[in-house]
C-alpha cells in the first residue's frame, strides 16, 4: 500500500510506469494507466464524461492504450436522467476510445438492470461502431463478462 496524489507518475518496479488522474464522479474516483513492456492498459471506472465532449485528462490517460477498460454503465437513451451520477455510456466510451487511438475498448461497469440479452445487443452495436480487430488481435470493442481474461 502506498499513498499518492492523482497525477503523480509512479514507477513501482523497473520498467513499470503507473500514471493516474482524477475522474468525474461524486465523492471522487481515480483512473489508472499502466505501461509495461511496450503495452498500455488504462482502467477508468466510476467516471462521467462531460456531455458532447471528451475530458482532456481522460483523453491523455487513454492515449494509444492497447486496452481501455471504461465505465459504460448506460446507453445514450438512459443518460439524460442520470447526469451527475458519475457514470458514462458505452457510446461515450466508443468516442473516447476512437479519439484516444485505443486498440480495444472493454465495456464494463454495467447497469444491474441490463440483463445478458441487453448486453448482447450492446456488444453487437459496439462491434458495429468499432469494427475489425486491434493490432493486439482482439476485437476493437468487447463487453466485459464474468470470467473474461484479456492480455494486451
Regions found by a protein language model. Name each.
Residues 1-56, 60-61, 147-152:
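Core dinuclear metal-dependent hydrolase active-site scaffold
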Residues 40, 48-145:
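Cap/insert and terminal regions of metallo-dependent hydrolase folds
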